[in-house]
A protein has these predicted regions:
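Aromatic- and glycine-rich beta-strand/loop motifs that create alpha-glucan
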Residues: 1-27
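Junction motif at the cytosolic side of a transmembrane helix
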Residues: 11, 245-264
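Hydrophobic/aromatic residues in alpha-helical transmembrane segments
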Residues: 83, 95, 184, 250-254
Length: 264
């Protein structure tokens, strides 16, 4: 167990070292989002941490009858690109051969990679939340005017009593959904090549924009798609369950692929 823990730590060190510039760009994206919301939208008015964070994970509410976007979800797509890139980089970096030898078995090697991918995803969402918390002067509040005029939803204002639902919609669902997509990406990266996995991952994220469907994991990354913000929105519990099923199935496939694939 100690050897496996060291393997995880070494993987994390290698991942953070290789992706330091990507993390920097990610932080810049979050900061620019907060600055734009504060000065470009609210013109200096009070904005709470909840508003900042929702602006980051909201995605798009729905597509009109002609399948036209009312807005381009830049931050959602930014998350998609950063997470997909880091996932691919973790699977294919210069430390791999050392880690394979250190792991001793292929199963431990792939499990260590999956663990590091999950930790990176959690790290990115938590970093975004912390930046928003500090930007909102540590006040976790929501501005009703902002939701009605800018975010385009007033349903939330009338249906926001379930505090546990906040945790599911704002944190659990996006993290699990992103991880489910990364697991699909890993399957294609192992079976074909790294670029194929990245392309598949981005396709899933993009298709999810145009279809409100619990079977498309990208919907879990967009808070506005949930029943908390849409009258006929998706059930967050169903979204999480489907994503967990995807994770389990892809894990089984990965273990099967890795058992016969030459990874050296």
């Amino acid at each position: 167990m100690k050897k496996y823990n060291k393997l995880i730590i070494n993987n994390l060190k290698c991942s953070f070292r290789n992706n330091i510039f990507i993390y920097f760009l990610f932080v810049v994206l979050i900061l620019l989002s907060c600055i734009y919301l504060k000065n470009g939208v609210m013109h200096g008015k009070s904005v709470g941490a909840g508003d900042y964070y929702f602006n980051i994970i909201k995605g798009v509410e729905k597509i009109d009858s002609n399948n036209k976007l009312k807005e381009i979800p830049f931050i959602y797509l930014g998350f998609a690109i950063f997470i997909s890139y880091i996932t691919g980089q973790i699977l294919e970096n210069e430390c791999n051969k050392i880690f394979i030898i250190y792991a001793g078995t292929r199963k431990k090697w792939i499990l260590s990679k999956i663990t590091v991918i999950f930790i990176n995803i959690v790290f990115m969402y938590m970093t975004a939340a912390i930046i928003c918390f500090m930007s909102g002067k540590r006040k976790i509040t929501f501005n009703s005017e902002l939701f009605e005029k800018y975010f385009g939803t007033d349903y939330f204002i009338q249906n926001n009593e379930n505090k546990f639902l906040y945790i599911l919609v704002f944190f659990a669902a996006p993290i699990i959904a992103s991880f489910a997509i990364s697991m699909v990406q890993t399957v294609f990266s192992l079976a074909v090549k790294n670029m194929a996995g990245f392309i598949i991952s981005m396709i899933i994220y993009i298709i999810s924009i145009f279809d409100i469907n619990i079977f498309l994991p990208g919907n879990g990354c967009m808070a506005q798609r949930s029943s908390l913000f849409m009258e006929n929105g998706l059930s967050v519990s169903q979204v999480i369950i489907i994503d967990i099923i995807i994770i389990v199935i892809t894990l089984i496939i990965q273990l099967k692929i890795i058992s016969v694939k030459d990874i050296l």
